[in-house]
Amino acid sequence: MRSPISAASRRLPTDRLPDRLTWSLAALGVTGLAAATIASPDRAGSAASQDWPPFVLVAGLLLIGLVADDDGLFAALGHQLARTTKNGPLLFCGAALICGAVTAVLNLDTSVAFLTPVLVYTARSRGGGEAPLLYGCLLLSNAGSLFLPGSNLTNLIVLGHRHLSGELFLSHAWAAALAALVTTALVVAVLEHKEVRTTRTESPASHRPVVGLGFVAVAAAAVLVIVLRSPALPVCGVGVFSIGVRLAKKRDRLSHVSDVLGLPVLVGLFGVAVALGTLGRAWSGPTVLLSHLDLVGTAAFAAVASVLVNNLPAASLLAAQAPIHP
């Protein structure tokens, strides 16, 4: 029988999207991809070559996250944190570190999908409110996505042409990423200070994970993301192999794996990203506009574009051409 945490972790963000909306996005993406390919095959090919690695990488990381979750690794983290840390502020700090680490290594999508239910269950098992850990996980997963290229698909789309290794990327981004993580944690802690101060005298029952395929897959992904300049295919290979073993042993279902991946959403976003990337290569407007903006203006413009069309298509559009100024 699956634990409450494991069962809850199946309710991923994509599960709440209406089927019509999901498949409409997929249809829009396929249509956009086809239109871009017909209109300008060369530009569409260039956009696709820039955009495919992030989507392949996140698919691999989600598969690895699924295997790790089945082994109880994430649930064990939550249980151990609740057992060893009775002090509310220390629990929140530990949760922030877990969110940052999982996001950095396994991508923000994996962190949100699998850690959110774990931390909510952890909070409830202590008798306290789940708001600090719930909001903290969602916000810290985004704040912690600046440490490595694979932590956020946008990183790979915008900087893909530079082919930076994870180690080199980390050497440049660690200070800003750490500042974002700490600042976000402080804001959540201040806003939810009453719940953060909750303490507990009793410890929840222990939860023993299976240290096996999931642990090995996570470790392999961490090494590949940090060492390789283009880790998408190797990481995806690890994910496919890991989930293939589970399917062969009938410990999971193909339909469940498909639900976790959210294939219609990935296909739709990829198609829209390629279409906008093709547009960005044919039209210099976005690049010229960015060249006239300072740091704050660039951030504001990128934020608005991300809200309007999603961050991935926006990144493909705005990074279609090399910026005039860094």
Pin down the residues of each PLM region:
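Hydrophobic alpha-helical transmembrane segments
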Residues: 55-56, 89-97, 111, 134-135, ...
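Transmembrane helical segments that form the transport core of multi-pass membrane transport proteins
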Residues: 66, 78, 218-321
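C-terminal ends of transmembrane helices
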Residues: 66-80, 120-125, 187-199, 244-257
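Hydrophobic mid-bilayer segments of alpha-helices in multi-pass membrane transport proteins
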Residues: 4-10, 14-39, 51-63, 211-220, ...
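Interfacial loop-to-helix junctions that mark the boundaries of transmembrane helices
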Residues: 13-22, 43-54, 164-176, 203-208, ...
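Membrane-interfacial helix-loop connectors
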Residues: 42, 103-105, 109, 113-136, ...
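Juxtamembrane and boundary regions of transmembrane helices in multi-pass small-molecule transporters
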Residues: 128, 167-209, 213
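Helix-loop-helix module between adjacent transmembrane segments
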Residues: 65, 98-107, 140-146, 176-184
